[in-house]
Amino acid sequence: MAPIAVGDVLPDGKLAYFDEQDQLQEVSVHSLVAGKKVILFGVPGAFTPTCSLKHVPGFIEKAGELKSKGVTEILCISVNDPFVMKAWAKSYPENKHVKFLADGSATYTHALGLELNLQEKGLGTRSRRFALLVDDLKVKAANIEGGGEFTVSSADDILKDL
């Protein structure tokens, strides 16, 4: 399957998270994105070094600037279960704007065409690192990394697209 690209309509799918009452919720991507300007970024794994020390902190630090440019939601997805994503989100007490969503079986990652095979590293199927700018379901920017790189999908890169 070809990776998601500029001009594509973001596919719908289900992701999971824990709400403020600590209840497990399943949500459709379209319900989060329709009619809004959204950043959807994906990482290979929660608690992994580049994801935890660079990618996520960049979006947390730049959230105010992104929101000032019309972004209404900043969504982080990873091929992890919702319990892991909840724990990872809690490791960023300063975070007020980034929502952490689980794609436990990589179903949504597959729908985006962004799977990354990390079986030889013991991690199974994961997501390529990426950042999408989506406006009312239409992809306006698709910054997709090759392999495990971190060169085009940062918050600063998305800011240039706004």
From Swiss-Prot:
Residues 4-162 form the Thioredoxin domain. Its EC number is 1.11.1.25. It catalyses: [glutaredoxin]-dithiol + a hydroperoxide = [glutaredoxin]-disulfide + an alcohol + H2O. Changing C51A: Abolishes catalytic activity. It holds the Pfam family Redoxin. CDD domains: PRX5_like. GO terms for biological process: cellular response to oxidative stress. It is an enzyme of class 1 (oxidoreductase). One of its GO terms (molecular function) is thioredoxin peroxidase activity. The active site is at C51. Keywords: Antioxidant, Oxidoreductase, Peroxidase, Redox-active center. Changing T48V: Reduces catalytic activity to less than 4%. Monomer. Homodimer. Glutathionylation of C(P) causes the dimer to dissociate. Subsequent reduction of the mixed disulfide bond leads again to dimerization. Belongs to the peroxiredoxin family. Prx5 subfamily. Thiol-specific peroxidase that catalyzes the reduction of hydrogen peroxide and organic hydroperoxides to water and alcohols, respectively. Can reduce H(2)O(2) and short chain organic, fatty acid, and phospholipid hydroperoxides. Plays a role in cell protection against oxidative stress by detoxifying peroxides. The active site is a conserved redox-active cysteine residue, the peroxidatic cysteine (C(P)), which makes the nucleophilic attack on the peroxide substrate. The peroxide oxidizes the C(P)-SH to cysteine sulfenic acid (C(P)-SOH), which then reacts with another cysteine residue, the resolving cysteine (C(R)), to form a disulfide bridge. The disulfide is subsequently reduced by an appropriate electron donor to complete the catalytic cycle. In this 1-Cys peroxiredoxin, no C(R) is present and C(P) instead forms a disulfide with a cysteine from another protein or with a small thiol molecule. PANTHER family: PEROXIREDOXIN, PEROXIREDOXIN-2A-RELATED. This is Peroxiredoxin-2. It comes from Populus trichocarpa.
